[in-house]
Amino acid sequence: AAMGSDFLRQEGANYFGFTNTRQPVANQFNFPNSLDPLKVSVPMNHSFGLSGGKMFHMGENRNPLSFFMVASHSSDYSYTREIVRNSITSGLVYQDQEGEKYSQNVNQLVLGNLNYNLNRKHSLQYNFMLIHANNQYVGEYSGKHGERHQDSEDYMGFHRRQQSNDNLLITNQLHSDWKLTDKLNLEAGVSYNVIKGLEPDRRENYLSRMTDGSYILTGSNRQKRFFSTLKENDINTKANLTYRLNDRFNSGRSSIMFGYTGRFVDNHFEAVEYNFTAVPGNISMDPLQLDNFYNDSNLKAGLFEMTRGDTNSYEVTKFIHSGFAEGTWQLFQNVTGNIGVYKFGNLI
């Protein structure tokens, strides 16, 4: 645990780490999250898990149906003190800062399995997996930065960065095995996977320190909020048809197989940044309450301007198909021959 009454946590994620991704409507400062981080009084690490399963017998033939599930949740806090220094090739130091970083990692894992056997010939299996991870932190740094505190004569200032990376993976798999005849067998399956990578409402604020020790909000697009979303839908299919052949050894290994696999993927990424001009006047640092300056009332009063940048995006669609044929023959008692043909097609 990271003990302390003033452990900082950014606003915008619930207990399970799922984040609020809503963006403001045009010309309104109605962001869903505060610029001022929350204070967590008792940031205790904790975790818990659940598991269970059962088997049933269905119908007159008492076909077995079984399921099993396991789920876990964890939340871990950490606090670090940091020293950040950078210089150019000549040795001149342009960054010399000390800071504090308050981090929280929230994770969930869910696994599920459902299996059904029909008449001891056919089987149907469903697998589910969910992995969710939210890594968020609040970082506060004070000191010299020659690039980002140019409003200060000696390049001194304060920087607060609040960032959350919210990632989710959901996997669904359905697999079946069908014994059509004594010699003919069909395996078929499909999976649908979803990936989401979110960075909602990253908040960066810079303040420059004047020679008299007071602070002002830094200009030149040093007050910003950033949103990005990556989504992927991934569908996979496969089918194998196997016909067993008779050989002189009655090995059961000789066969011919025909199969197909396909993959269909859609990727979409979108990112946008909001920039704010500096609200004029001195800023109190104890406590630092930026919501008193950046709000909808001050925007409408003309104390600062808000600019929404151009949306950066890309989209990729992939279609992948492949087919194959394979033959296996028991040549001798301890020698098996195998030959196959594979055809691959890719369209992006």
Provide a role label for each language-model segment.
Residues 1-19, 101, 158-163, 255, ...:
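Short intrinsically disordered, low-complexity coil segments enriched in acidic
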Residues 115-133, 161-348:
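Face-selective signature of the C-terminal outer-membrane beta-barrel domain
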Residues 31-139:
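Transmembrane beta-barrel wall of Gram-negative outer-membrane proteins
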Residues 81-93, 140-154, 202-212, 272-282:
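Flexible, surface-exposed loop regions and adjacent strand-edge segments
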Residues 57-64, 144-153, 246-251:
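Intrinsically disordered, low-complexity coil segments
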Residues 1-18, 72-84, 133-137, 195-207, ...:
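Short, solvent-exposed beta-strand-terminating loops
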Residues 1-44:
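N-terminal, post-signal-peptide soluble/periplasmic segments
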Residues 26-45, 93-109, 157-170, 222-234, ...:
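Outer-membrane beta-barrel proteins
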